[in-house]
Amino acid sequence: MERGFCMFTDASGQQIAVNARLVWYVKANQPETTSLIFFDRDHAVSVEGTLDKVITKLRDAYN
């Protein structure tokens, strides 16, 4: 996985890679909650929580 991308699983179980700078995934049944696995070089960081928490985690990874 290239730096700056995150991987998430949608409601159908399909895994989707998206640019972490641009896109986040909001769970259909819990719109206030976001679940991402963020890949940065050789490690992955799973982030689950409020949208603010996820955005903060992604921002901190790049700053």
Task: Locate predicted features.
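Acidic, Ser/Thr- and proline-rich intrinsically disordered linker/docking segments
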Residues: 1-17, 21-63
